[in-house]
UniProtKB/Swiss-Prot annotation:
Protein name, entry field: Chaperone protein HtpG
Role, per record: Molecular chaperone. Has ATPase activity.
Location(s), subcellular: Cytoplasm
Iron found in the keyword field: no
Subunit details: Homodimer.
Cited InterPro entries: HATPase_C_sf (IPR036890), Heat_shock_protein_90_CS (IPR019805), HSP90_C (IPR037196), Hsp90_fam (IPR001404), Hsp90_N (IPR020575), Ribosomal_Su5_D2-typ_SF (IPR020568)
Main location: cytoplasm
Region called B, residue ranges: 342-562
Organism annotation: Cupriavidus pinatubonensis (strain JMP 134 / LMG 1197)
Pfam families for the chain: HATPase_c_3, HSP90
Region described as A: 1-341
Renumbered residue ranges of the record's region C: 563-633
GO cellular component terms listed in the entry, alphabetical order: cytoplasm
């Protein structure tokens, strides 16, 4: 006879489960205090809600607060709140059942606006057990608000899978958690250490966290505890206040606090977003780039709070990488965290915050860049000098905002006689010559190299503006920025450069004539430069230089090849095209030279000079010097 169908429960070894949670769930020991303070904060919020319907629960003690007290002699740490407290059944149910959250259960009983107003933090029901990270025994004494003093309860456990519960008498409502510290954890009994943890994680929860006040004792040259209590947290989150109540000085002071920066920020935006994802954002644009802006191993991101409790310092998921320089705070009512609340999990809510924050930052930048006030535009100039190269990364990272980012770009240009990157693409388009349908640019290692590039000669002759691109990221950026306002971006170093209607018929006829006249010389030159140049031809794009190198359509530019090699990356060895200026004296002499060393040496010098002019490196500098010396002799 077959066995009957049964539904059975998984069995868990509670002792092993506790050990796993205590030693594996949290990566940072100090997290225990954040979790216990969060629980205490939840308890006071529960009391506030229940007291709305039943004011007697306050028991003439409406001063809600959390008290933290360390006893170095007894090696204990006490966390006390005068919140809702727990009955015997609640203590057994909430503390004796792992992953059961009383806060979550309470929250589910609220409805409508009550839920929106609730600042309850607990989510998983495991935060309490973080106490065992630093304590080998935990004692909880608690009395629920509204019940008699003799109905209080003591819950105690050593974290071995068992706990005891006793009835006690407790005059005050609320809960006291006493941690009996493990050996080697006395650091968490230091008042200075406790204050620093509180200010890091719980500075902005809505109620005061108090500790015994200490004063300096000159006789003992040490701090001495007094009977007074003092608040050690701000108990107020700036970002939760209405913007109209916050002064510029307060915004600046808060930025300097969270960013550890002595300078004032360039700009900030403060918004509360409501809808499917509810969160508050306070974002700043710094005035100076951090020293580690380009360190990919260093984490960059916003400070993340959930209901005003600090969760993490560098929440990289809340902004794209190209905005990693933004400082600020995101405070969400509900975000998917892992069980230890140390890692943010990707979700639609996280994506919505990232997209919303990105749009806010770009709007800030647009406001500065397009402002009618010179002082605001000057701020954008400062921003661009500090963070412009990082913003360029956005063209490849953020397809949805590509057009907005392109409008914010700034470049040096032949329009100005300096290296300042101040020309926008819109300004360039607005100055284009009649008949011009392309945006022209040149890339080089330095502004001087770009400004003096032989490729610009024909453009100067015709009065056509060319953008001078000298940032290492520019070549990569251009692979994503193919056009702007319907105008194609074209490198002046491309061999198939077509000026369209900007080239008159006489010039085209002259080019065809030169190609015919120099046909034999070009053929000889191709033979000499086989393996070094993909092609040789004459050009009228040069007016002062004898030669230049250009890239064939579809080939990687020489500048980009050099960048990749410098970065240790493999780069295709695309050979350049040598273009000769038939009107230059050095080139004219080629036509008069017979085949042989004289012709070869002069041609190779012209090739090497063109390579040097565009910032390239010679394969054999010594041979180049010898050839030049021959010509000079």
């Amino acid at each position: 006879m077959s066995a009957p169908h049964e539904t059975m429960s998984f069995q868990a070894e509670v002792k092993q489960l506790l050990h796993l949670m205590i030693h594996s769930l949290y990566s940072n020991k100090e997290i225990f205090l954040r979790e216990l303070v969060s629980n205490a904060s939840d308890a006071t919020d529960k009391l506030r809600f229940e007291a709305i319907a039943n004011p007697s629960l306050l028991e003439n003690d409406a001063d809600l607060a959390i008290r933290i007290e360390a006893d170095t002699a007894a090696r204990t740490l006490k966390i006390t709140d005068n919140g809702i407290g727990m009955s015997r059944d609640e203590a057994i149910r909430n503390l004796g059942t792992i992953a059961r959250s009383g806060t979550k259960e309470f929250f589910q009983q609220l409805s409508g606006d009550q839920q929106k107003d609730a600042a309850l933090i607990g989510q998983f029901g495991v935060g309490f057990y973080s106490a065992f990270i630093v304590a080998d025994k935990v004692t909880v004494e608690t009395r629920r608000a509204g019940v008699a003093a003799d109905e209080a309860v003591r819950w105690e456990s050593t974290g071995d899978g068992e706990f005891t519960v006793d009835a006690i008498t407790r005059a005050e409502r609320g809960t006291t958690i006493t941690l009996h510290m493990r050996e080697g954890e006395d650091d968490f009994l230091s008042a200075w250490r406790l204050k620093s943890i509180i200010q890091k994680y719980s500075d902005h929860i809505s109620l005061p966290i108090r500790m015994p006040k200490e004063v300096w004792d000159a006789d003992t040259s040490a701090y001495k505890r007094t009977d007074e209590w003092e608040s050690v947290n701000q108990a107020s989150a700036l970002w939760t206040r209405p913007k109209s109540d916050i002064t510029d000085e307060q915004y600046i002071a808060f930025y300097q606090h969270i960013a550890h920066d002595n300078e004032a920020p360039l700009s900030w935006t403060h918004n509360r977003v409501e809808g499917r994802s509810e969160y508050t954002q306070l974002l700043y644009i710094p005035a100076r780039a951090p020293f580690d802006l380009w360190d990919r191993n260093h984490k960059h991101g916003l400070k993340l709070y959930v209901k005003r409790v600090f969760i993490m310092d560098d929440a990289e998921q809340l902004l794209p990488s190209y905005l990693r320089w933004v400082k600020g705070v995101i405070d969400s009512a509900d975000l998917p965290l892992n069980v230890s609340r140390e890692l943010l999990q990707e979700s639609r809510d996280v994506k919505a915050i990232r997209e919303g924050s990105t749009k806010r930052v770009l709007s800030m930048l647009e406001s500065l860049a397009d402002s009618e006030e010179e002082a605001e535009r000057a701020k954008y100039t400062t921003f661009w000098q500090q963070f412009g190269q990082a913003l360029k990364e956005g063209l490849g990272e953020d397809n949805a905002n590509q057009e907005r980012i392109a409008k914010l770009l700034r470049f040096a240009s032949t329009q100005n006689d300096n290296a300042e990157q101040s020309v926008s693409l819109a300004a360039y388009v607005g100055r284009m010559k009649e008949g011009q349908d392309k945006i022209y640019y040149v890339t080089a290692d330095t502004w001087a190299a770009a400004k003096n590039s032989p490729h610009l000669e024909v453009f100067r002759k015709k009065g056509i503006e060319v953008l001078l691109l000298t940032d290492r990221v520019d070549e990569w950026m251009l692979s994503f920025l193919r056009e702007f306002d319907g105008k194609e971006l074209v490198s002046v170093a491309r061999g198939d450069l077509d000026l369209g209607s900007l080239a008159d018929e006489a010039e085209k006829a002259e080019q065809e004539k030169a190609e015919t006249e120099w046909k034999d010389v070009v053929a000889r030159a191709k033979t000499v430069l086989e393996g070094k140049a993909k092609d040789v031809r004459v050009t009228l794009r040069l007016t002062a230089s004898a030669s230049c190198l250009v890239s064939d359509e579809g080939d990687m530019s020489g500048y980009l090849q050099r960048l990749l090699k410098q970065a240790g990356q493999k780069a295709p060895d695309a050979q350049p095209i040598l273009e000769l200026n038939p009107e230059h004296a050095l080139v004219k002499k080629l036509r008069d030279l017979p085949e042989g060393d004289g012709f070869n040496d002069r041609l190779l010098v012209l090739f090497d000079q063109a390579l040097l002019a565009e910032g390239g490196m010679l394969d054999d500098p010594a041979a180049y010097v010898q050839r030049v010396n021959k010509l000079l002799a």
